[in-house]
Amino acid sequence: MAVNNSDYLNVIERKIIDELRIFFNTHHSSANNDVVKVYGQFPEPEELKFPSVVIEQVGSGFEQKMMGEKVTFGGTTYTGELYGVAFVINILIDKDTEYNIGTSPQGTTNAKYKQRRLLNWMMLNIANTITSIDWATAVSSVPAGLSYNPRYDASVEVVESHLRAWRDVGYLPAFQWYGATAEFSLIFKNYR
């Protein structure tokens, strides 16, 4: 836990982005190194690569304000409150993108998913990755080229988190893109 950490929101956002980058870039060994792009905001159109995951912070604020703002967590008294933050997670896949998932459920080795099948696979694995984030444990191995910063580990005490159902799942014919959107929110202890 980090007291007087005025950077909680950036720490949380970076941790989500890095955990997704680590998952997608290490899944099935080096076959997928740098295949899936994970962005912290929508990139400029000319910089957009596929497949991509775009994490957008859409809101934050006090979840529960304490009387007098003095709170006791674990026997120690601090100034603070419970604070919430919300993100929208977007998946974008163009019609030509493929991703090597390894061995498919049908037994195919080096199976390459694309279009709707890739979208379904990414929705499930993003959900699994995000809900499995251990906010208190440092990541032990990081692929080269990722921006992961171990100082972000163990600096946020998450009270609860919620990943809501994927929506707007489908195909956009004008761009020939597949996509889906989900909302993720979490509540953490904001010590000051």
Task: Go through each PLM region and give its residues.
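Charged, amphipathic alpha-helical segments and their flanking helix caps
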Residues: 1-37, 59-192
